[in-house]
UniProtKB/Swiss-Prot annotation:
Enzyme class: transferase
GO cellular component, one term: plasma membrane
Pathway(s) of this molecule: Bacterial outer membrane biogenesis; LPS core biosynthesis
EC number: 2.4.1.-
GO-annotated biological processes: lipopolysaccharide biosynthetic process; lipopolysaccharide core region biosynthetic process
Transmembrane intervals: 9-29, 74-94, 104-124, 127-147, 156-176, 197-217, 251-271, 291-311, 316-336, 345-365
Changes seen on gene knockout: Cells lacking this gene produce a normal lipid A structure with GalA at the 4'-position but a modified LPS core structure as this gene deletion results in addition of GalA to the 4- but not the 5-position of the outer Kdo and nearly complete addition of GalA to the Man residue. The mutant cells are also more susceptible to deoxycholic acid when compared with the parent strain, and more resistant to the polycationic antimicrobial peptide PmxB.
Protein name (record): Lipopolysaccharide core galacturonosyltransferase RgtB
Subcellular location: Cell inner membrane
UniProt xrefs under InterPro entries: LipidA_mod_glycosyltrf_83, RgtA/B/C-like
Gene designation per UniProt: rgtB
Topology term for the membrane: Multi-pass membrane protein
Molecular function terms from GO: hexosyltransferase activity; pentosyltransferase activity
Family of the protein in this entry: Belongs to the glycosyltransferase 83 family.
Amino acid sequence: MTESNRRDISWIFALLAAYFVLQVGVRLATSHSLDLDEAEQAFRSQWLAAGYGPQPPFYNWLQYTVFQFAGVSLTALSIVKNLLLFISYLLYGLTARLVLRDKALVAIATLGLLTIPQMAFEMQRDLTHTVAVFFSASIFFYGFIRSLKQPSLASYLIAGIGIGFGLLAKYNFAILPAAALIAALSDARLRPRIFDWRLGLTAAVALVITLPHLFWLKDNLDFATARTLEKMTASGDASYLTQVAMGVSSLALAIISFAALTVAVFAIVFGKSLRPALGSGSEWTRLLERMMLVFLAGILLLIVFGGAAGIKDRWLVPMLFILPLYFCLKIEAAGVETGKALRRFIPVVAVIMIGVPAALYGSVAAARFTGHYERLNRPYAGMLEILRKQAEPAAILAGDSLLAGNLRQDIPGVPILSADYPGFNPDLTSRRPLLLVWLLPKGGSEALPPDMAEWLQANLGTSAPEASVIDVPYFYGRGDDRYRFGYAWVNQPG
């Protein structure tokens, strides 16, 4: 091993910490408006529940807790996400250090996560629940590998925490610990680590963490799973064979989308030595191979027997996030010299660390030149500021959760309901005036949406009030481009 490979790897974590601080700054500088998942967190922070709908509640619980101390703000949202991502990378690096001797490969494996588009770009853009899955998977994977190599009460406890958090992050997380269990049981040398009394602690911790949500899930199974199943099985009137073909092809495309850039980067960095390295192996590469095979087999079962027709690349995060580490284990097993590879890898990482924040900011700011607007260009705060000059609302009914969450961060002391989410329905009988706000589709009707009119009639016995329209300049708007909102008042004073 070269001298450069022996040096301490703490610089990796310092670099990542600086990167995620930069991401917080870029997010705050880009726009005050919230995207879909951010708005969902702001909206649902008005109440604490054992379950909220199609997504398990881990991220909601975490964000609710932070909001109680820090207030509802974009800053709190961005810090929570990037702190979770930093901890995930940190745990991934610690896991790599457990199984890799070459410190250069530890660095490449850890920073290699940035070569996965779903990890580096999509998680910054939105996808809060996928961030929670990655965080949970990193905890579990560290606890699992440590339990196999350096078993202790703490390692089994960490694995249990990871499983508990993961099941509260996304239901498909269950495939990961199942794959790990089957993969370890199939190796006689690792089997004693599974038939260990401390595994009972793992199961107990996971059960305690998930128990409140499991009680809720028992009574709300259809509500919790209907939307996900609808997405997975959206094959129209296709025949069974067509549905299976759609599912398998979508899985193949998802794998390519997830892994292609990482494979390309490793091919560039290691050159001709990569291909023979992929034929090498160790007990750790064989373990990871079995885990990935079991995970993919589980998804294939969902396709063949569960009717899944559309597999999304982000659904592969609980397993395929191990790819950079897997490649590095292969390379170490082949005895490839890594000093030059690390020097070639660092510029790639630098391009990603600069390019991703620039792309995130540019996708919104470029609207002033292109006229193409994202959700973050919408001027929710400007609209609310104008309407509050007409009257101070005692409560707000928004047309959807995206709008409700954006309003919530600017007027946190007022109950905000959403017409598309019946789970939060406080008594508004004595709260007047009530402000109704909705998004106006291009070329659509300016009248009060039917679902909001139905809500008023069902909950307040009130007929639809007169609707008005307000238009507000976009963030980074081109020329005089403006975004239009519909609004109405119920019992406006004066």
